[in-house]
Amino acid sequence: MFFIHKRFRMLYNMHMKIGIYGGTFDPVHMGHIFVARSVKQELGLDSVDFVVAADPPHKHSAERTPAALRFDMVCAALKRERGMRASDIEIRRGGVSYTVDTLREMKRINKKAGLYFIVGADMLEDFPKWKNPKEILELAALVAVNRRGQERDIEALADGIRAEFGGRVEIISAEGPDISSTEIRRRVQNAQTVERLVPLSAEMLLYEKRLYQPKSIEQLAERVSNVLDEYRMRHTMLTVREAVGLAQYHGLSTEKARLAALLHDCAKLGREETVRYAEKMGYALTNEERENPFLIHSRIGALLARDLYGVQDTEILNAVERHTVGCAEMTPFDEVIFLADKLEPSRDYRRIRDLRELAFRDLDRATIAVLRNTIEYTENKGMRIHPQTEITIAALEKRVKARLHGGD
């Protein structure tokens, strides 16, 4: 049986068509995915390998994300893409990577398969200057992807390459999203959302690993990570992601939202430590709060944000303080941080998809719905409901009613 299976694999490999898509992927984005899908469909490829560069000759940057992290993001992005996989062939080889070296190794691994090396059409102009261009075309067909309407200019370049080096040059026109990795990095650094520009699983990873953030946020996140455990820090960074998206959609300060989200759980210190810090700061605790310090971590967090992390902005401090059970005077900014905490993408509970959609339509109604969901969960666990929860709901319902009836 093993013999038949092995023979089948060998026969299959003889007829396989494999796309090779190289790049730094710093980070991988939906433009990359669209190109791979288009080429795969157009040429009938069996698979596309995303070859993550260690040090490609045409891109040098001291600020480049470590190869292992870029590879992990590509793996995450391709998890649900059929017939696509990440390759660390250049990373394992190390040093400066040339296309011809990668194709030699790919051909050694896939002796009978047809290889298709995928590039942006803008790279055709410099192709004759690449290392061993003739051998590249002996090892693989060159597939140039360009935007529709540029076919004539690209075809002339392709004809020149065919005439000089022989081999096969394919041109594929695709009208995908106009995205660059540079733009993704810039947006993250400037606290702008990259939702739908980067595959969600890769986007989550870039936030978890705190990539592309400004130096001040990197340093603050490092301080916070020294206090929180790994699980809580992951949640914190994904709350940052959600807060930035909600704030941007609702026209609020995304930079403030990023900072508030980063500090929202800075007092999740454990029961004894939370109580000890509260007493040190002169905060009078009720018996209920002593028994359940999680009820006050948001209030203590606001004190820590001010006294330990140097935040003086009242809007940020209020949002940190109000992110657990809210208050009657919740502002839209408060609601963004509250909702980001409850709806960040690692959360998974009943109705969360509907709640996320509602959060982008109506902050008040989404906050009410999440609070009611919290009450249901708390009651099912046999725990007491914080009295502020009902006060917050009543105030927000009154506000929604006034808004719907024009204030009458």
Tell where the protein language model's regions lie, with residue ranges:
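Nucleotidyltransferase catalytic core that binds NTPs
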Residues: 2-216
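Alpha-helical structural context
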Residues: 42, 109, 164, 227, ...
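Residues at secondary-structure transition points
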Residues: 61-69, 93-97, 230, 234, ...
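Charged phosphate-binding loop/patch that engages nucleotide di/tri-phosphates or the phosphate backbone
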Residues: 193-217, 376-408
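Divalent metal-dependent catalytic cores for phosphoryl transfer on phosphate-bearing substrates
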Residues: 222-226, 235, 244, 249-371
